Amino acid sequence: MWNSSASQNHWGSARLPRGVRIYAIGDVHGRADLLETMLSKIDAHCRLHPSANSITVFLGDYIDRGPASREVLDLLLGHERTKEAVFLKGNHETFVARFLSDPVVLDEWRLCGGLETLLSYGLKPSINPDTSEQIRLANELAKSIPREHLEFMESLDLSFGCGDFLFVHAGIRPGVPIRNQKEEDLLWIREEFLSCERPFENFVVHGHTPVRTPDIRSNRINIDTGAFATGRLTCAVIEGSAIVTLLST
């Protein structure tokens, strides 16, 4: 774990509005234990360093892979009621609705950690469900998943802009104005975005592609540190034109 005092600017003139501080949290992937720890760290940081307007931005991929997707969504819903927060959609949040309407989607979803999500809702899937089991599991999930969980995942934003910063799950397609970006790219893009060294319209804060430590570039920062496998959930604290600190579990 680390609590780095970054206080550095790698992106030129990009800055947040005066008085705004953003806590951006990377991919959680079913690790409710780490999310709970991180939210406590953020609360402690806020108490030590009061800000006129603190916003927590969650970068998506709350479910799958880790053991406690249901508990993660409960924590996020509780946070939504008490704090100023922005919840972005990750590619993994698209699987639930797709599976409920077309159970064979589980062929793809299980390869992305979907079975762990089903287990968190009390279902008991086999390792490689056939079509009849997929249909049964979809019916069981429809009965067991709280409506507020479905409504939460359906309400997630694709991006959030604040000052000169853009917060998004995966990234953006280079050369395409932000207003014209496609949902598929915002949720899934990798190489074309990651390899681009040119300045973007805004400095991009993202997750989606796991890295060992936060990857800070001149045009973006990646804070997906593979929490479900590494035990390291990362939060970038941004204020003015600098990363004030990097919090980690």
Regions found by a protein language model. Name each.
Residues K83-E116:
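Active-site HxH/HxHxD metal-binding segment of metal-dependent hydrolases
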Residues W11-R18, L48-H49, L76-E80, L158-G161, ...:
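A short acidic-Thr-Gly-centered motif at the start of a beta-strand
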Residues H29-G30, D64, T94, I172, ...:
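Short, glycine/acidic-enriched loop or turn micro-motifs at the edges of active sites
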